[in-house]
Amino acid sequence: MKIHLLLAMIGTFVVIIGAQDQEGFISLDCGLPSDESPYDDSFNGLTFTSDSTFIQTGKIDSVDKDLNINLSKQYLTLRYFPEGKRNCYSLDVKRGTTYLIVVSFVYGNYDGLNRDPNFDIHLGPNKWKRIDLDGEKEGTREEIIHKARSNSLDICLVKTGETLPIISAIEIRPLRNNTYVTQSGSLMMSFRVYLSNSDASIRYADDVHDRIWSPFNGSSHTHITTDLNINNSNAYEIPKNILQTAAIPRNASAPLIITWDPLPINAEVYLYMHFAEIQTLEANETRQFDVILRGNFNHSGFSPTKLKVFTLYTEEPMKCGSEGCYLQLVKTPNSTLPPLINAIEAYSVIEFSQLETSLSDVDAIKNIKNTYKLNKITWQGDPCLPQDLSWESIRCTYVDGSTSPTIISLDLSKSGLNGSIPQILQNFTQLQELDLSNNSLTGPVPIFLANMKTLSLINLSGNNLSGSVPQALLDKEKEGLVLKLEGNPDLCKSSFCNTEKKNKFLLPVIASAASLVIVVVVVALFFVFRKKKASPSNLHAPPSMPVSNPGHNSQSESSFTSKKIRFTYSEVQEMTNNFDKALGEGGFGVVYHGFVNVIEQVAVKLLSQSSSQGYKHFKAEVELLMRVHHINLVSLVGYCDEGEHLALIYEYMPNGDLKQHLSGKHGGFVLSWESRLKIVLDAALGLEYLHTGCVPPMVHRDIKTTNILLDQHLQAKLADFGLSRSFPIGNEKNVSTVVAGTPGYLDPEYYQTNWLTEKSDIYSFGIVLLEIISNRPIIQQSREKPHIVEWVSFMITKGDLRSIMDPNLHQDYDIGSVWKAIELAMSCVSLSSARRPNMSRVVNELKECLISETSRIGEGRDMESKGSMEFSRDIYNEVIPQAR
């Protein structure tokens, strides 16, 4: 059954336009001028906006007004692409969320050439489908159900011949993550029908997910209907008016048969069948039937639930082969009534086997692109893939389709770059060659370049850099790093460069002033020996020593210096609008929301006057954040140190902390197992940096879920460094210190001995792992085993994985990934610190957990609702195709 756009454009839609929520919907009218306001579709009430903010290329036009076709407004305009081979839309989505993605194409002879275009459409780096509009006067649409692998979704139009790619509309709808689950791959729609003799298609607002349902009336069927209300509260949320009609065989003794042809022959298909009993049965009446697919019993003795939907679906895909596909509903001997069915969906599997480029590399290169407005025509879509469409000026390393490519060479020479060398460059984890030559970059050469272990060439020549080159970078040059710095007149490779430059001027001045200096010294000594010895009580503490009062002497300078922005208290009041919006409160004080430079959101942590350790922790945190920089550590924007007023200003993290998400206090959104792994991996990378990337290394001392903050893309960053301490390098790996931390997360060995090592952080991180696994309190006195470590150990001895896991996940996870995470967590919380892994090992094992989860062969199915049931695993080793 070919799905024509005509169904969506001229079919009579049964809709109730009103209070339905379009939250999470993306509805783009491709070609709508950017200065036109969003509008509501007259058929269904969906709000469409211009696509102009989601793509920077292409031109817009309108279909030929003389065409004799009736089109909805969003199909009257289009965007076409005369430049570049690949042009991509970049859309914000949530990683791990399942989406229904619909793209529509109406040529409409916009160019007057009467040449129907053909081209490819890609989803990320993978080809989705060949689009051929030959003979498609009314246009065509393609649907796919796809789980987002990152927080950005690229939909790309790829030119393959002489005609230009076009697009008319893009519609994206979030679905529940426990529906349309596959063993692997995404789902292309084959057909979606409801059994009725109606001629009306149904979509939003009747269908809250905006799935389009076409009526289907088989010649051997008849139909029954009801006006009674149907309970549609299962995960698939089938529209009630669809469930109020059903098909039964014309011959009550015959089976109800539905057939369709496979397309292609070996296509793998998932089938979803929705049933509801809509007739009132008498005491002596029963409706019971067997569900048979391709001659195999799939579910025997099935009886639909009265006025309530029940969904049967294939747990594994099927292949129908050349004979075609057929579904039989066969009345059992005990049944007095014929079988019925209300609606059916069939999807074919499409494997998107090529993983996207490394997410950290993608984030970094897109950040650079946006910051410097690098409008290169090839810089669209995935940077490295497909290989023949990779971005100019970069080179990537490729292993195989199951491994994400990484960027190994970046050439931004002669690109008009200005300002300082961007810190985001350190996100390129495998970068070998960096060319920033012949730009207008200013400021010092940053130390982080020396910490990028894979770099073998750095070309900074032809800029306006200044200051001294970091010694660590010069040391790496001696070890083989190619470092090109020529053409920076104010940059020097020696710490004595400023002295050398001024020698010619200073020497004659010093010579002529020597006698004057001698006279001044003699006079000064005379007065010094006459002066009374100063009383110790009149001496101020040296600048390196803080005074005991948090509101330290205003005549004394602050006990630290910072290159970060120092704000006055009045500026802090202004940025927080006089502290009108509190984000939370901790031991340090209240955290407020604010703005710097009008648009940059910040979080302002204001020291409470009652905080006994406040100034000490304040000083420690500023000094630490002044010298550490990592993508997984919260950045310090600035600070305030004015009399009794102390404040820390951080980057704003709009998604709060991990604890809020686990507890459901942040919008009620349940983090998937994949999302949880990515978050703790981010946190682990930040902690690994503190332990191994800092000089000297640092112990955080307060790792917990409330100190793991999430940005708008759910990227995790460690926060709250007030308790952090450095620890020695070399043989002596611990320091004696007063015990500090949070009960429940605190390392028992550290608590007993007062000896602090990086392994104390490992213990706390293990508790965090157990928290994201189980989503249970760290300490719960009502449990037989109150502490979470004891409780999980007890459950492991029972082999009770299901009781350990967060029930909100509904078993939607890879068992191997989960067990590996539990084993890792338990090794982290070993009572002996010597038996705990280091953070590098933790990072590697979390990566393995994540790989196992993202590539799992089979995923768990939601059985929370009794309105759905999967088919038996051992019936099928083949799958379905397409409808006719």
Curated annotation (Swiss-Prot):
The active site is at D702. It comes from the Eukaryota. Its EC number is 2.7.11.1. PROSITE patterns: PROTEIN_KINASE_ATP, PROTEIN_KINASE_DOM, PROTEIN_KINASE_ST. It is found in: Membrane. ATP binds at L583, G584, E585, G586, G587, F588, G589, V590, V591, K605. Binds to the ammonium transporter AMT1-1. Belongs to the protein kinase superfamily. Ser/Thr protein kinase family. This is Probable leucine-rich repeat receptor-like protein kinase At2g28990.
